[in-house]
Amino acid sequence: MVKVGVNGFGRIGRLVTRAAFNSGKVDIVAINDPFIDLHYMVYMFQYDSTHGKFNGTVKAENGKLVINGKAITIFQERDPANIKWGDAGAEYVVESTGVFTTMEKAGAHLKGGAKRVIISAPSADAPMFVMGVNHEKYNNTLKIVSNASCTTNCLAPLAKVIHDHFGIVEGLMTTVHAITATQKTVDGPSGKLWRDGRGAAQNIIPASTGAAKAVGKVIPELNGKLTGMAFRVPTPNVSVVDLTCRLEKPAKYDEIKKVVKQASEGPLKGILGYTEDQVVSCDFNSDTHSSTFDAGAGIALNDHFVKLISWYDNEFGYSNRVVDLMVHMASKE
């Protein structure tokens, strides 16, 4: 089992750790966070307003974080180059601070003995992988990779299925997205984009997202054919993608449902889900899929122009994919 270090114990850092313990697929051996001391880590890991209390044991013992009886080394370094990952036995590092998202910055982890780095965010220059879409293109010469964004992980599997069967001529995506830590609780300053600084709990906020364009990086045939935007809405978790696209081959909506359902039960099982139930956002809290197609919510204008809806737990689904990507990478060592 691959030994993993986590840099940044925020929403994704903590949930990747939860996903690792839930799945037993990877071994968390070290955590670095300069802003959270050991006893605070115990508290933050144990209690979660969104996903509930951790179903297991967590305590501090001999200067280590002990989860389900497993001792985890704790570092509190601000500079990634100073984290002694090698000493803790960490081979892979999940870079989940949201700060060190370029090859150069994330590469600092290699200095401390890490063999590979997985950036839990989109990256300007690191190769991006989406499980179920282009993970097979990974090869072990790559030391630094990105798991793309939660929204790209939702959109790409759906876009792949639709494009493989019917061809996407062009498409626009809107994600109706839950609040995240970058937003403000009440109106406050936001450097580049003024609207982003408005109170998260009281507004629908139009925002930018690179998620749709990023699909073109993981599915090259769709490069330049998709773009999109976001609405940030006052919910704590779970988001939904609305993909409106023009199809090359004509397709009845029932045919689209059929191919998505087949994919969800076959090659994309566990990644792309499918439901015909009358669901709402809360129904996907703590769901581990990257994307769940909502068959009843989509509409077709005609055989070439459709709107497709897919839900995702933007925290937990994504965190589970980070774990899956590491498992896949470890299989190529």
UniProtKB/Swiss-Prot annotation:
The modification N6,N6-dimethyllysine is found at residues 3, 64, 192, 213, 225, 258, 261, 332. The modification S-(2-succinyl)cysteine is found at residues 150, 245. A motif ([IL]-x-C-x-x-[DE] motif) lies at residues 243-248. D-glyceraldehyde 3-phosphate binds at residues 149-151, 180, 209-210, 232. Residues 2-146 are annotated as: Interaction with WARS1. The modification Phosphothreonine is found at residues 73, 151, 175, 180, 182, 209, 227, 235. The modification Cysteine persulfide is found at residue 150. Signal peptide: none annotated. The modification S-nitrosocysteine is found at residues 150, 245. There is a cross-link at residue 184 (Glycyl lysine isopeptide (Lys-Gly) (interchain with G-Cter in SUMO2)). Keywords: Acetylation, ADP-ribosylation, Apoptosis, Cytoplasm, Cytoskeleton, Glycolysis, Immunity, Innate immunity, Isopeptide bond, Methylation, NAD, Nucleus, Oxidoreductase, Phosphoprotein, S-nitrosylation, Transferase, Translation regulation, Ubl conjugation. Homotetramer. Interacts with TPPP; the interaction is direct. Interacts (when S-nitrosylated) with SIAH1; leading to nuclear translocation. Interacts with RILPL1/GOSPEL, leading to prevent the interaction between GAPDH and SIAH1 and prevent nuclear translocation. Interacts with CHP1; the interaction increases the binding of CHP1 with microtubules. Associates with microtubules. Interacts with EIF1AD, USP25, PRKCI and WARS1. Interacts with phosphorylated RPL13A; inhibited by oxidatively-modified low-densitity lipoprotein (LDL(ox)). Component of the GAIT complex. This is Glyceraldehyde-3-phosphate dehydrogenase. The gene is GAPDH.
